[in-house]
């Protein structure tokens, strides 16, 4: 498997259920994840509980909801060897909607309500449109926006600065399938970030 770090101990649990007999729905999916990861010093570095529910309607539209809770943990990486700090417990909520992907024009909308490491709100929203005139060509235009009240940056020697930030990220992708084995893809993306110093930490 893939490890995000070389001093990691994991004990995770995943549950996934697909129901195809739910009244008024084509499909209902439920997933439950428990993430429990520690470093070799015995400190919790990644903890989380996730409950996800997806509803696929008879007209093939999809509604998603995700609830998340991150218990208190230790961040031992952002400081790059200058020290660890404690991250308080945080909550999160995701809402999503997608229209029928088989239509020539399909739309998607997502809302993400979360918290930064220091506790203040982090809000994200995205929308997309997909144009698929035939089975060989498709284009996808997506726009993401993120508003953060406490973007934490390590400035060196154990000094940190939190920023109020706003980020826009448009993305355009076009695909053309020459045949069953060959595909051409063109992707253009751009990210704009504006940040203002807010508080200083040591």
What are these regions (language model features)?
Residues 1-202:
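Exposed, low-structure sequence patches enriched in small/polar residues
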């Amino acid at each position: 498997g893939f490890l995000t770090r070389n001093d990691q101990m994991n004990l995770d649990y995943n549950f996934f259920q697909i129901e195809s007999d739910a009244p008024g729905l084509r499909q209902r999916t439920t997933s439950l994840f428990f993430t429990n990861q520690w470093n070799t010093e015995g400190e919790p570095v990644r903890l989380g509980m996730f409950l996800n529910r997806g509803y696929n309607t008879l007209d093939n539209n999809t509604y998603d909801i995700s609830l998340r809770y991150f218990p208190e943990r230790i961040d031992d990486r952002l400081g790059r060897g200058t020290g660890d700090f404690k991250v308080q417990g945080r909550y999160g909520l995701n809402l999503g909607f997608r229209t029928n992907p088989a239509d020539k024009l399909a739309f998607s909308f997502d809302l993400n309500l979360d918290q930064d490491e220091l506790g203040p709100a982090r809000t994200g929203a995205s929308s997309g449109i997909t144009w698929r005139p035939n089975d060989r060509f498709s284009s996808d235009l997506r726009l993401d926006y993120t508003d953060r009240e406490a973007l934490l940056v390590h400035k060196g020697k154990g000094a940190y600065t939190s920023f109020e930030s706003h980020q826009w990220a448009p993305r355009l992708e076009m695909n053309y399938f020459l045949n069953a084995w060959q595909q051409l893809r063109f992707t253009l993306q751009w990210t704009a970030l504006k940040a203002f110093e807010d508080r200083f930490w040591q």
